[in-house]
């Protein structure tokens, strides 16, 4: 089995740039995932985020999760649970407008730390989108502009904790799915594993590494690249020991952004020169995804194709 792609972003600044860009290209084409080291976010910032996120879970979320487990009788289940996940979560929205000041139970220091972390992640996401543009032969800024809509991108962080699970064979931490959006930046626990992706019909562990950022591609990048890059099924396996922390930040198109394959990539395809993917408004896709998240993505694309006969505003 090939090694999971780990990319040192510092090497973009020297004589290993071409090789590093090739590694990113291969990861996007063949994995849909890669792990970044030396990505520019200071280790001390990440350490503070981790410490405060784990502290907040202990103080504000842990007891609620225990009560939820008890109310649903999850510790005594005898058959596979298919309609919920063994996770405790809350969501922070950064763009187009932040909700951090409104989220209850966060102390002011944690709010400030997360605002700062979000700005750094936003910058990194946009840098990565331009690296993808370079590899795809698209002009710099193409993907950011494709995501922009009228109010800019949607950007937010799902803060998750996966407590020890007594029945990991029957309850998933998070059921298998592809991500609906654009590019996802994950800061995950470096001690408690659980994230897996599907490659060549095998589930492969995404290795926990201290101070790394795991990147994966969402459905919208598959559409814009006309299938050259793919969103990939992934899941979280619950563990019997240790609580796994996960901060997944989703840099997504704006709600009214019109998504469609880049014309140059359609033209570059072989003789057929066909556009395989539909054209749609991102918010319409999200409404469909909300009910079908844990099902295959292909029927979602087909459903959006069926809607294409309707005129799309601003297309």
Swiss-Prot record:
EC number: 1.14.17.4
One MF term in the entry's GO annotations: metal ion binding
Iron listed as a keyword: yes
Tissue and organ expression note: Predominantly expressed in the petals and the stigma and style.
PROSITE patterns in UniProt: FE2OG_OXY
Pfam families recorded: 2OG-FeII_Oxy, DIOX_N
Alphabetic keyword roster: Ethylene biosynthesis, Fruit ripening, Iron, Metal-binding, Oxidoreductase, Vitamin C
Keyword field contains Thylakoid: no
Enzyme class: oxidoreductase
UniProt pathway: Alkene biosynthesis; ethylene biosynthesis via S-adenosyl-L-methionine; ethylene from S-adenosyl-L-methionine: step 2/2
Name the UniProt record assigns to this protein: 1-aminocyclopropane-1-carboxylate oxidase 1
Organism per entry: Solanum lycopersicum
Gene symbol of the encoding locus: ACO1
């Amino acid at each position: 089995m090939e090694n999971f792609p780990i990319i040192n972003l510092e090497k973009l600044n020297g004589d290993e740039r071409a090789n590093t860009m090739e590694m990113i290209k291969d990861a996007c084409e063949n994995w849909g995932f890669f792990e970044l080291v030396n990505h520019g976010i200071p280790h001390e910032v990440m350490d503070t985020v981790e410490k405060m996120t784990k502290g907040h879970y202990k103080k504000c979320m842990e007891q609620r999760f225990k009560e939820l487990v008890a109310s649903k009788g999850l510790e005594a289940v005898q058959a596979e649970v298919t309609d919920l996940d063994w996770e405790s979560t809350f969501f922070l929205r950064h763009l187009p407008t932040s909700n951090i000041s409104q989220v209850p139970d966060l102390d002011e220091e944690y709010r400030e730390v997360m605002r700062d972390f979000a700005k750094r992640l936003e910058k990194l996401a946009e840098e990565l989108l331009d690296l993808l543009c370079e590899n795809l032969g698209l002009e710099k800024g193409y993907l950011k502009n494709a995501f922009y809509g009228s109010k800019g991108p949607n950007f937010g962080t799902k803060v998750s904790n996966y407590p020890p699970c007594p029945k990991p064979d029957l309850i998933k931490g998070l059921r298998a799915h592809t991500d609906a959006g654009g590019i996802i930046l994950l800061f995950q626990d470096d001690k408690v594993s659980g994230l897996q992706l599907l490659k060549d019909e095998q589930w492969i562990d995404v290795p926990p590494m201290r101070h790394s950022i795991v990147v994966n591609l969402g459905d919208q990048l598959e559409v814009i690249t006309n299938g050259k890059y793919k969103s990939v099924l992934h899941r979280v396996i619950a563990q019997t020991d240790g609580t796994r922390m996960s901060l997944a930040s989703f840099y997504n198109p704006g709600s009214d952004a019109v998504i469609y394959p880049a014309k140059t990539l359609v033209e570059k395809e072989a003789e057929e020169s066909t556009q395989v993917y539909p054209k749609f408004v991102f918010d319409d896709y999200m409404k469909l995804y909300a009910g079908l998240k844990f099902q295959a993505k292909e029927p979602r694309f087909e459903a959006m194709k069926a809607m294409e006969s309707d005129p799309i505003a601003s297309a």
